[in-house]
């Protein structure tokens, strides 16, 4: 189940939509699986933001975040819901992701927004540039999901396990077009998130099973991911 309102910012004004699309949507599926006694494998996509990192890293042993954001709180409830229904011998897994990037993302998602600004030589306004996040490329995430689908039922955190700062993303994107980002980027504190975590990275141990069982490693992350996004975007008319 990969549907749902996935914007942390938009969830503040769309609390009910966020809850319905994630919690109620998931629960409807689980009730049917339980009633029909189906052994269908069911994955629920979730977010690393539900956890409070230890030394900037997250794993499944981390405590839940105390952040009051509606999206984060909803996904925490969904995480527990999956674990609760798994007790009925259902084949259920939480798949925890960090940032997943794709050129099909909405234009307001950070990396795509920055790359479009750079490619079109346009000025952009951003929030906190001094946070570090773990960005993964969509094609590699899909492959990792397929490999994970053959493994035993439990919860997984899937990410590249590498960090890059917002500032480095901006510098790299504008550099690809021969531009000095300082002339094009301004900061507005209204885009700063409440209770912003400085560093949110998935531990590389989270995906050791992919390396050990399938010899799979993430290759597109950091500066290479920025180049991939930039390359795959056209310029706006």
Where do the PLM segments sit?
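NAD(P)H-binding glycine-rich loop region in Rossmannoid oxidoreductase-like domains
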Residues: 1-20
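Flexible, glycine-rich beta-alpha linker
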Residues: 50-52, 66-70, 93-113, 132
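Short-chain dehydrogenase/reductase
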Residues: 26, 30, 79-83, 142-145, ...
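Active-site beta-alpha turn of Rossmann-fold NAD(P)-dependent dehydrogenases/reductases
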Residues: 3, 43-46, 53, 68, ...
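Active-site Tyr-X1-5-Lys
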Residues: 53-55, 66-93, 115-120
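C-terminal substrate-binding subdomain of Rossmann-fold SDR/epimerase-dehydratase oxidoreductases
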Residues: 112, 118-237
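Conserved Rossmann-fold NAD(P)-dependent oxidoreductase catalytic core, especially the SDR/UDP-sugar
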Residues: 1, 27-70
């Amino acid at each position: 189940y990969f549907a749902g309102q996935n914007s942390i910012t938009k969830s503040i004004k769309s609390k009910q939509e966020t809850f319905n699309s994630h919690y109620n949507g998931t629960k409807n599926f689980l009730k049917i699986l339980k009633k029909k006694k189906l052994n269908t494998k069911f994955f629920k996509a979730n977010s690393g933001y539900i956890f409070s990192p230890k030394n900037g890293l997250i794993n499944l042993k981390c405590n839940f975040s105390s952040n009051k954001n509606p999206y984060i709180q909803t996904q925490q409830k969904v995480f527990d819901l999956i674990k609760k229904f798994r007790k009925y011998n259902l084949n259920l897994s939480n798949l925890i992701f960090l940032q997943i990037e794709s050129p099909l993302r909405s234009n307001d998602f950070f990396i795509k927004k920055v790359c479009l600004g750079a490619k079109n030589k346009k000025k952009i306004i951003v929030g906190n540039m001094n946070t570090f996040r773990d960005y993964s490329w969509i094609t590699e995430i899909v492959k990792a999901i397929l490999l994970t689908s053959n493994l035993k039922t439990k919860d997984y955190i899937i990410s590249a396990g590498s960090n890059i700062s917002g500032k480095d993303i901006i510098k790299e994107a504008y550099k690809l077009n021969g531009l000095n980002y300082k002339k094009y980027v301004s900061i507005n504190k209204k885009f700063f998130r409440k209770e912003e975590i400085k560093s949110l990275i998935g531990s590389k141990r989270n995906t050791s099973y992919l390396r050990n069982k399938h010899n799979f490693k993430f290759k597109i992350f950091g500066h290479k991911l920025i180049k991939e996004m930039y390359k795959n975007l056209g310029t706006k008319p």
